[in-house]
């Protein structure tokens, strides 16, 4: 067996190299077409914004024409190649959508429209008050989170449900909840609380306890997404939840995230009880180092209609 050697056919390799070059030429042509489409779209968005429309309304108008496009496959293909050709076409479709999102943001900024992450979320000034269930680990998390406030106020809750209700009723601005147990696994009970109450993660910090061996993570949560400042060397996270019925949309989203310079940090499958029964969901956490998620948020708004932002946050390690 040791004498067996694999020697690929040089003609096959040369032909594949030539086809790669041709594919590169075609890809650049796609980029040029996408550039013109993005230029036209950015002009339309500029006009809509000047007429008082919001960014969501403007992007939704464009989305109606772009999101349902079906990848085309030539008619003379061999039947046995259809499945692989479909995969290639889907990959090109994901590339097109990510590239269009990038080019659209570039076109808007060239027109003086400084679109950023904050434009995609509700603006709300919240009380500088924080509720949590008193214990050593939660108090350690409070010491970290409270540094972001000028005059933080503390309110103890009897249990996690009360802490959540205090936020939902507006009696306090934020709550502190345990998020991950030792080893990094998400606490399923907290994940369900976030889903049912529609709370957002504003910040995350590790806590270690008096002996230094607890190694859990706690989250600062509120009803609205809070966009943290960007600083050199900061890792920032965008957490999303999408319905698990469409696996193609999930795989396309992951491809787009990579194209737009973000890293897939974590993915979980979840099941939640709703009025329509138990439904599956994907939970994705995307990571960027000192970057932002504006291009990704444009992509999501245009092409992923059923996503939910769970938060943009830093891990305050």
Q: Which stretches of residues belong to each language-model region?
A:
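Domain-level signature for soluble enzymes in the chorismate/prephenate branch of the shikimate pathway
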Residues: 2-317
């Amino acid at each position: 067996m040791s004498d067996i050697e694999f020697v690929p056919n040089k003609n096959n390799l040369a032909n594949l190299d030539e086809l790669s070059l041709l594919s590169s030429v075609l890809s650049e042509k796609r980029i040029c077409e996408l550039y013109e489409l993005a230029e036209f779209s950015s002009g339309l968005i500029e006009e809509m914004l000047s007429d008082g429309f919001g960014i969501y309304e403007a992007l939704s108008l464009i989305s109606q024409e772009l999101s349902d496009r079906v990848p085309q496959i030539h008619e003379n293909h061999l039947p046995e190649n259809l499945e692989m050709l479909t995969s290639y076409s889907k990959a090109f479709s994901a590339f097109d959508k990510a590239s269009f999102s990038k080019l659209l943001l570039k076109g808007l900024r060239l027109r003086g429209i400084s679109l950023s992450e904050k434009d995609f979320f509700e603006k709300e000034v919240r009380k500088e008050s924080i509720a949590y269930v008193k214990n050593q680990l939660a108090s350690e998390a409070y010491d970290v989170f409270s540094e972001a406030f000028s005059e933080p106020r503390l309110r103890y809750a009897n249990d996690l449900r009360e802490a959540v209700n205090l936020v939902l009723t507006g009696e306090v601005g934020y709550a502190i909840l345990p998020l991950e147990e030792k080893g990094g696994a998400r606490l399923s009970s907290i994940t369900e609380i976030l889903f049912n109450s529609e709370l957002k993660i504003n910040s995350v910090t590790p806590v270690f306890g008096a002996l230094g061996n607890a190694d859990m993570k706690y989250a600062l949560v509120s009803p609205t997404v809070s966009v943290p400042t960007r600083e050199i060397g900061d890792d920032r996270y965008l957490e999303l939840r999408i319905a698990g019925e469409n696996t193609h949309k999930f795989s396309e989203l992951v491809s787009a995230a990579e194209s737009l310079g973000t890293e897939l940090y974590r993915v979980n499958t979840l099941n939640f009880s709703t009025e329509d029964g138990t439904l599956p969901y994907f939970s994705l956490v995307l990571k960027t180092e000192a970057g932002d998620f504006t291009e990704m948020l444009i992509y999501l708004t245009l092409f992923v209609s059923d996503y939910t932002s769970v938060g943009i946050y830093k891990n305050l390690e």
